Structures are given as structure tokens and as C-alpha cells.
């Protein structure tokens, strides 16, 4: 626990120093004179090597890594069609199984084991983390210099919460998060057609992506119906939206449509608990791993409806493109904090979205929210990985972080 606390302290001091001595003065001077792509290339390379080394030397979360290694071998050896019929635990939709098939093939070809195997299994998530940082750089580059844009990207590339998630834990939240970021980026750029396919891929990788459905609906309302509406535009968007659904069906075919439907329904119904190690409202109340009742199930839905209603209010109140990123972060973080059946890592996409909101409209509140959500996610994932696995009864309640984060979100 001391190591976790020291990492938080160091990260907070580093973030404060970066803001005070670089970002804030650079924003005030608003200088955009350098044009050197080597900045982002160097930062991305260092972040990639760091993640790869950490991924190789530390196995990760025992249960999750065992699942990914086992699934990669099973899907490669048995094929897509038999995977969901095997007598083994599997709670992921088919999207990531395509990735694990390639991982399994490489593992069999080269006979990787131990550190090399750990790094290989974590590699897709690591690559997606780096690409998310590059996307943040791309968005920032529209307004700022290469140097400052790289600093913004580095706030994500070297974020301790993102490093722990993919490199140490071995989870794949960064994979579907990349497609969430791309979906919302395309919506903010009024490129709705691309966003439909990004959303389809998100859903195909992780059903938690359904949380972001309101963002896609907001984009359709604003970019298809409100701005320059025409029958041709509507039909074009409808056609590509249907095409995205057809893509999902085609990708599901090798696994068997009925198997995929069963997998989604089983996954959505799994973990019927108030919270699963999440540092949220239910965790702060001491309800970790407590089973759902009819009453708490209704309360969870009430919270979810309230969150969506609040996101509608915030979205249509805002007047700039950063609202897409901010409302996406709001949906992710508020759902994680208030809804039931939430896991420790479910607020992960909020970090990248808040950073994109900040670089789009450099409001200091966005930076503070990014720091608080990072603090919450790092504490949660690091605690589960390094403390909880060894002492499951030692549950840490993060009420101060929860309260501070909720106040700033609600005061928006």
C-alpha cells in the first residue's frame, strides 16, 4: 500500500509541476511555432518500451491472465466455431477472440513462455494504449505546437493508471477504449459514418460499450437531423448504420450466431453484485460483492436513467465540440460510481475522454477531473492487483476520491 500511495504522491506532484511550469505558461503564450514529429515519436517509443518491459517482468492478475492465455490457445487450437461450445469459462464476446487467435498462433509458432508469453498476451492492449496517446496528440496538434501536444499525449502515455491496467494487470480495457475514443472523435469531426463502425467494433469487443450509446444518439441528432438535414443525408447515414450492424453479424458468423447471442446474454447477466471491487458509492457503503436484490436492482436502473438524463442536460447546454468527450467521460465515470454491477476498471475510458476534452477546450476543471479520475482508477486497480489478491478481506474505501470527483462532475 505504501508503494501505491507514493506513486500517487509522485504522480500528483509531477502533474502539478507540468501544469505550473509548462502547460499553463504555454497556453498563455499560445505559441505554435515548432513542427517536429520526433517529439511524439520519441514519447510513444519510450512509453511502448516501458510498457513492454513491465509486461514481461510481471505476470499480471492471475485470474485474468490465465483466462487470456487459455482463450488464446483454445480459440487457435479449436477454431472459432467450437470456442463457445468448449467446457471452459469465457465471458468475452467474439471481437477480442480474433485478436487472441493471432496471439495463440504466434505463441504456438515461436513457443513463447513466461516473460515473452506475458508480453505477447499484453501486446494488443499496449499498442492500443500508445495509439490512444497518438490520437490525443493529433487532436491537440490542431491548436498547439508539437511540443505542447506531445506533453498532452504524454499525460496519457505515462499515466500510472493506464500503465497498471495493460502492462501490469494484463487487462484489455485500452483496446475497446481506443475505439470509443475514435468513435467520439469522428462524431466531433462530423464524420458520422466512421463512428458507426467504431461503435460496432466496441460492442463486439466489450458489451460495456453500450454505456456510450447516448453519445452516438446525440451525434446523430446534431449532425444528421439538426445541421443541414436532407433526405439523402438521412438515407446515407441509415445505410451505413445498417452496414455496421451487418459487419457485426458477419464477424459473428464463424462463432455461430446462436453461440454469440448466448454469450452476450450470459455476459450481461453475470456478476449479479452491487459492486465487484469498484471504489464507487456501493464500495464506500461496504457493499463489495453483496448480491443484488430486487430493490437494489431497481435503484441501479434509477441511477442509470438519472445519469443519462443528466448527460442530455449537459450535452445540450454545452456549445463546443469538447462536449462529446466530456459527456462520454461523464457517462463512463458516473455509471462506474453510481450504478450496480460495476467492476474496478469500468471508469477506464473516462481518462482518455477527459484529456481529449481538456485539449479541445483548455478548461482547468477538465484537467482537475482528469487528475481525480486517474487517482481513482490507479488506486482501484493497483489496490486490487497488489493488495486484494493477497488479502481479499482488506477492502479499501475511497469515499474522499468519490465525493471530490462527483462534486466536480455535478458542478459542471
Where are these regions (language model features)?
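Transmembrane helical bundles and short interhelical boundary loops of multi-pass, membrane-embedded
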Residues: 1-12, 18, 39, 46, ...
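Transmembrane-helix motifs of polytopic, lipid-linked glycan transferases
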Residues: 18-22, 119-143, 305-315
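Aromatic/glycine/proline-enriched transmembrane-helix motif characteristic
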Residues: 28-31, 35, 110, 266-337
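Hydrophobic alpha-helical membrane-interfacial segments at the cytosolic entry of transmembrane helices
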Residues: 43-46, 229-254, 372-376
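Short helix- or helix-capping micro-motifs
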Residues: 47, 152-158, 199, 203
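Extracytosolic helix-loop segments that constitute the early lumenal/periplasmic catalytic or substrate-binding loops
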Residues: 64-91, 95, 103-111, 257-263
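Specific aromatic-rich, kink-prone transmembrane helix
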Residues: 135-138, 175-192, 353-354
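Perimembrane helix-loop-helix junctions
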Residues: 212-245, 349
Amino acid at each position: 500500500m505504501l508503494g501505491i500511495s507514493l506513486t500517487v504522491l509522485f504522480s500528483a506532484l509531477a502533474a502539478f509541476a507540468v501544469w505550473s511550469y509548462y502547460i499553463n505558461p504555454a497556453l498563455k503564450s499560445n505559441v505554435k511555432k515548432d513542427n517536429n514529429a520526433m517529439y511524439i515519436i520519441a514519447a510513444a517509443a519510450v512509453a511502448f518500451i516501458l510498457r513492454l518491459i513491465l509486461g514481461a517482468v510481471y505476470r499480471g492478475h492471475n485470474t485474468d491472465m490465465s483466462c487470456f492465455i487459455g482463450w488464446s490457445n483454445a480459440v487457435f487450437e479449436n477454431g472459432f466455431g467450437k470456442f463457445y461450445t468448449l467446457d471452459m469459462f469465457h465471458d468475452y464476446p467474439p471481437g477480442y477472440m480474433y485478436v487472441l487467435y493471432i496471439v495463440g498462433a504466434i505463441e504456438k509458432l515461436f513457443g513463447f513462455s513466461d516473460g515473452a508469453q506475458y508480453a505477447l498476451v499484453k501486446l494488443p492492449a499496449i499498442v492500443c494504449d500508445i495509439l490512444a496517446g497518438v490520437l490525443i496528440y493529433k487532436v491537440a496538434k490542431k491548436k498547439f505546437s508539437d511540443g505542447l501536444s506531445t506533453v498532452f499525449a504524454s499525460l496519457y502515455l505515462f499515466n500510472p493508471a493506464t500503465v497498471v491496467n495493460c502492462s501490469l494487470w494484463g487487462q484489455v480495457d485500452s483496446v475497446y477504449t481506443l475505439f470509443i475514443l475514435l468513435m467520439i472523435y469522428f462524431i466531433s469531426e462530423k464524420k458520422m459514418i466512421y463512428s458507426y463502425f467504431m461503435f460496432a467494433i466496441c460492442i463486439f469487443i466489450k458489451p460495456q460499450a453500450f454505456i456510450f450509446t447516448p453519445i452516438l444518439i446525440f451525434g446523430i441528432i446534431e449532425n444528421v437531423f439538426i445541421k443541414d438535414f436532407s433526405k439523402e443525408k438521412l438515407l446515407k447515414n441509415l445505410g451505413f448504420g445498417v452496414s455496421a450492424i451487418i459487419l457485426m453479424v458477419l464477424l459473428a458468423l464463424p462463432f455461430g450466431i446462436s453461440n454469440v447471442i448466448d454469450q452476450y446474454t450470459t455476459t450481461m447477466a453475470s456478476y449479479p453484485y452491487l459492486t465487484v471491487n469498484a471504489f464507487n458509492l456501493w464500495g464506500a457503503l461496504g457493499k463489495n460483492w453483496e448480491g443484488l436484490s430486487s430493490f437494489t436492482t431497481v435503484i441501479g436502473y434509477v441511477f442509470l436513467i438519472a445519469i443519462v438524463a443528466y448527460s442530455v442536460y449537459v450535452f445540450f447546454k454545452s456549445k463546443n465540440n469538447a462536449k462529446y468527450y466530456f459527456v462520454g467521460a461523464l457517462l463512463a465515470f458516473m455509471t462506474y460510481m453510481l450504478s450496480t454491477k460495476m467492476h474496478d476498471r469500468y471508469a477506464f475510458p473516462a481518462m482518455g475522454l477527459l484529456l481529449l476534452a481538456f485539449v479541445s477546450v483548455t478548461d482547468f476543471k477538465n484537467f482537475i477531473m482528469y487528475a481525480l479520475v486517474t487517482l481513482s482508477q490507479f488506486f482501484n486497480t493497483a489496490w486490487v492487483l497488489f493488495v486484494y489478491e493477497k488479502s481479499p478481506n482488506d477492502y479499501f474505501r475511497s469515499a474522499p476520491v468519490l465525493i471530490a470527483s462527483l462534486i466536480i462532475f455535478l458542478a459542471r
